[in-house]
């Protein structure tokens, strides 16, 4: 990507030019407010130093309460924020028994200098939406709802073979409860979302089903090549939803965004506390927050959590990488997100730790070398783990491939690091490492279009 030199500032102490290489957007809430009203903070990234400074006019309202995900389309013109809403008591702890209300997807246009302008609001078909992705072309948007509207666990109505609900119709007679995926097509001129109906499945009343059921208790999902994979598991008593045990595949159509079931059963992973599913550089990574002792590169390693890498086969089937499971850094826990840096040499894993308040010694960033010959394998980068703010929720690499940023929940900050391109070590920025937010961060993304 070529950077456009808008607003170049010349330094008289250096031959370097300083300019904005991209914009970092962080969703979250405001600590001073009890309503959970969401905000989006825009941050300019300096090309030379990685310094963070405010985008004019931000933070702006996210369009609802408790934003949890944001997606920027490939064109960088449209940004979508998923607001989870709040329970009847005003809590952000959305559960099947106490669901959140007034959830929505708010569309923003991205203007000059990274300015965000709210446009329209859209809604999912299910209950408790909490994850959102776009396909690679930016033509389709998908939202994962924790509960389908007629799921027995949510509705309290037990379906029968004579009177099935959507879960049974799509997933088989034993599936009386389920989550769902709401799918949209994206108008490339306006960003407006249009609902995609479930063509293969007809509702019990004969009408088209307006969503795509997935197994009960979903945790996370991702598009992986020609499939959309959903990690599901055991019921979670509170948000965030964890306990992932298996992965269910839908076949994805790039032409129309349609999702089609190719097998009715999930693939068990042999884990009990899956926290996230990430597709990066051709590999599916499942993050699992339970202890493991393993011989890792000829060293017996005991960790509080682990990473399971897979290759996606036909019909979305997962095949474990030959190198087997990967231990998390022994000093960290509760992995929540993973990125592969742009050159494909290093993997970084954000661990939010198992503490939920204040400073968190178990949170930070684990780092790995990637080896692909003779087989895929990871090995720890020397001097890892790397510091972050407390409770990182996400990781992004800046458009110039120099810096890695985390957005942090517990201490309401963004933390930046410089990537050593040879060793993969994440060093401190030459300027201030952190950027203070108005409240806890929940997600982050980066935009490389600066004109």
What are these regions (language model features)?
Residues 1-13:
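Sec-dependent bacterial lipoprotein signal peptides
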């Amino acid at each position: 990507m070529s950077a456009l030199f808008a607003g170049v500032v010349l330094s008289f102490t250096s031959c370097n030019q300083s300019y904005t290489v991209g914009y970092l957007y962080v969703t979250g809430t405001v600590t001073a407010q009890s309503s959970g009203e969401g905000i989006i903070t825009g941050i300019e990234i300096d090309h030379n130093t990685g310094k963070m400074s405010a985008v004019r006019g931000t933070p702006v309202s996210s369009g609802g309460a408790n934003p949890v995900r944001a997606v920027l389309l490939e064109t960088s013109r449209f940004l979508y924020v998923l607001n989870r809403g709040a329970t009847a008591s005003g809590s952000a702890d959305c559960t099947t028994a106490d669901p959140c209300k007034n959830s929505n997807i708010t569309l923003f246009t991205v203007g000059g200098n990274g300015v965000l302008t709210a446009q329209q609001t859209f809604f999912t078909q299910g209950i408790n939406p909490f994850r959102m992705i776009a396909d690679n072309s930016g033509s389709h948007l998908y939202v994962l709802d924790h509960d389908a509207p007629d799921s027995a666990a949510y509705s309290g109505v037990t379906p029968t073979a004579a009177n099935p609900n959507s879960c049974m119709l799509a997933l088989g007679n034993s599936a009386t409860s389920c989550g769902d995926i709401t799918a949209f097509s994206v108008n490339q001129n306006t960003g407006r979302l249009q609902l995609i109906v479930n063509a293969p499945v007809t509702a019990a009343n004969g009408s088209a089903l307006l969503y795509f059921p997935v197994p009960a208790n979903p945790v996370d999902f991702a598009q992986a090549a020609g499939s959309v994979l959903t990690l599901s598991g055991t019921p979670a008593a509170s948000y965030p939803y964890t306990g992932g045990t298996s992965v269910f595949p839908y076949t994805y159509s790039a032409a129309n965004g349609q999702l089609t079931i190719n097998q009715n059963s999930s693939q068990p992973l042999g884990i009990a506390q899956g926290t996230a599913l990430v597709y990066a550089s051709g590999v599916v990574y499942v993050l699992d927050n339970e202890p493991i002792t393993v011989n890792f590169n000829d060293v017996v390693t005991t960790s509080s959590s682990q990473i399971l890498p897979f290759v996606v086969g036909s019909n979305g089937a997962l095949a474990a990488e030959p190198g087997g499971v990967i231990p998390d850094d022994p000093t960290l826990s509760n992995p929540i997100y993973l990125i592969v840096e742009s050159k494909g040499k290093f993997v970084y894993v954000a661990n939010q730790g198992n503490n939920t308040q204040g400073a968190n010694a178990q949170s930070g960033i684990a780092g790995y070398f990637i080896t692909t010959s003779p087989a895929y394998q990871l090995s720890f980068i020397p001097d890892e783990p790397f510091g972050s703010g407390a409770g990182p929720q996400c990781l992004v690499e800046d458009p110039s491939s120099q810096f890695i940023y985390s957005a942090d929940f517990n201490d309401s900050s963004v933390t930046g690091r410089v990537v050593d391109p040879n060793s993969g070590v994440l060093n401190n920025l030459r300027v201030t490492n952190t950027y203070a937010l108005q409240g806890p961060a929940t997600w982050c993304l980066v935009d490389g279009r600066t004109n």
